[in-house]
UniProtKB/Swiss-Prot annotation:
<dbReference type="InterPro" id="IPR007842">
    <property type="entry name" value="HEPN_dom"/>
</dbReference>
<comment type="similarity">
    <text>Belongs to the UPF0332 family.</text>
</comment>
<protein>
    <recommendedName>
        <fullName>UPF0332 protein PH1297</fullName>
    </recommendedName>
</protein>
<dbReference type="Pfam" id="PF05168">
    <property type="entry name" value="HEPN"/>
</dbReference>
<dbReference type="InterPro" id="IPR052226">
    <property type="entry name" value="UPF0332_toxin"/>
</dbReference>
């Protein structure tokens, strides 16, 4: 599978996981919702890394490389890296119990994730439509 196909695959998974997270939350399936929210963010981060030719194999590598290449460069706000890191921790915690604090964090996380997902989709569409690959070249220079 070449890079654009792999990126498309992760974008599709991101969209599916985000949709599932909302549906599960609306139906009171909190643990599953937190897990799906985390995987949505994970696959979005993985897609961005693949665009730069970076392919970490572990979740910890995706989180670390996402921070290094996108947050530290200023391309993505630091708060998004925190959401990704915290959602991974929350996902692990929810296997034990659900608290009101986790529930509030999840609702906030889903709102932020929806906004950042819309931004990623707009960026990806622009990237695909640019026949001269100017957007890709600018992106890779970050």
């Amino acid at each position: 599978m070449d890079v654009p196909e792999e990126v498309e695959k992760h974008i599709k998974i991101t969209e599916e996981e985000l949709s599932s997270a909302y549906l599960l939350l609306e139906n009171g399936k909190l643990r599953d919702s937190i897990s799906r929210a985390y995987y949505s963010m994970f696959h979005a981060a993985k897609a961005l890394l693949l665009l730069k030719g970076i392919d970490p194999r572990k979740h910890s590598g995706v989180i670390r490389m996402f921070g290094l290449h996108f947050v530290n460069s200023g391309f993505i706000e630091r708060v998004y890296a925190k959401y990704l890191t915290h959602s991974r921790s929350d996902q692990r915690l929810t296997m034990m119990s659900i608290t009101n604090q986790v529930m509030r964090k999840l609702k906030t996380l889903l709102k932020v994730l929806s906004a950042s997902w819309r931004e990623l989709k707009v960026f990806w569409r622009r990237l695909k439509m640019d026949k001269k690959a100017q957007a890709l070249n600018e992106f890779l220079k970050l």
